[in-house]
Swiss-Prot record:
HAMAP family: Ribosomal_uS13. Pfam families: Ribosomal_S13 (PF00416). Part of the 30S ribosomal subunit. Forms a loose heterodimer with protein S19. Forms two bridges to the 50S subunit in the 70S ribosome. One of its GO terms (biological process) is translation. One of its GO terms (cellular component) is cytosol. Residues 98-122 are annotated as: Disordered. This is Small ribosomal subunit protein uS13. The gene is rpsM. Belongs to the universal ribosomal protein uS13 family. Located at the top of the head of the 30S subunit, it contacts several helices of the 16S rRNA. In the 70S ribosome it contacts the 23S rRNA (bridge B1a) and protein L5 of the 50S subunit (bridge B1b), connecting the 2 subunits; these bridges are implicated in subunit movement. Contacts the tRNAs in the A and P-sites. Keywords: Ribonucleoprotein, Ribosomal protein, RNA-binding, rRNA-binding, tRNA-binding. The keyword Lipid biosynthesis does not apply.
Length: 122
C-alpha cells in the first residue's frame, strides 16, 4: 500500500483516483501530478514502484499544499474573516450560509436540526 502525504492510498484503485483520497487533491490536480512525474493514469496503486511513489511524494511536497497544512490555512482564513468582522465572518460565526443563499425555509445543513419554538400559555 502506497503512503503519500500521510494517507494510505487504496491498493486496487487506479493511481489517478487513488490520489484523490488526499485532502486538497482532486481528479484534475491528480492528473497534473501524474503528467509532471510521467506515470500513466491506468496504473494501479499496487503496481507503483518505490521510485514512482517517491517521485509523486516529491511533486506533491514541492508544488501543492495538502492535508494538515491546507486544513490549517483554510481555518486561519476563516478565522481572519471572523476577526475582521466582515459579513462573511459574521455568517461563519453564526453558523449560517456564507454565500448569499436564502434561509427562510432551507439551509438545514448549516443551521442544524430544527428548534421548535413552543406556544406560550397564558
Amino acid at each position: 500500500m502506497a503512503r503519500i502525504a500521510g494517507v494510505d492510498l487504496p491498493k486496487k484503485k487506479r493511481v489517478e483516483y487513488g490520489l484523490t483520497y488526499i485532502y486538497g487533491i482532486g481528479l484534475f490536480t491528480s492528473r497534473k501530478i501524474l503528467n509532471a512525474v510521467g506515470i500513466s493514469y491506468d496504473k494501479r496503486v499496487y503496481e507503483l514502484s518505490e521510485d514512482e511513489a517517491a517521485a509523486i511524494r516529491k511533486e506533491i511536497q514541492e508544488h501543492y499544499m495538502v492535508e494538515g497544512d491546507l486544513r490549517k490555512s483554510v481555518a486561519m482564513d476563516i478565522k481572519a474573516l471572523m476577526d475582521l468582522g466582515s459579513y462573511r465572518g459574521l455568517r461563519h460565526r453564526k453558523g449560517l450560509p456564507v454565500r448569499g443563499q436564502k434561509t427562510k425555509t432551507n439551509a438545514r445543513t448549516r443551521k442544524g436540526r430544527r428548534k421548535t419554538v413552543g406556544a406560550a400559555t397564558k
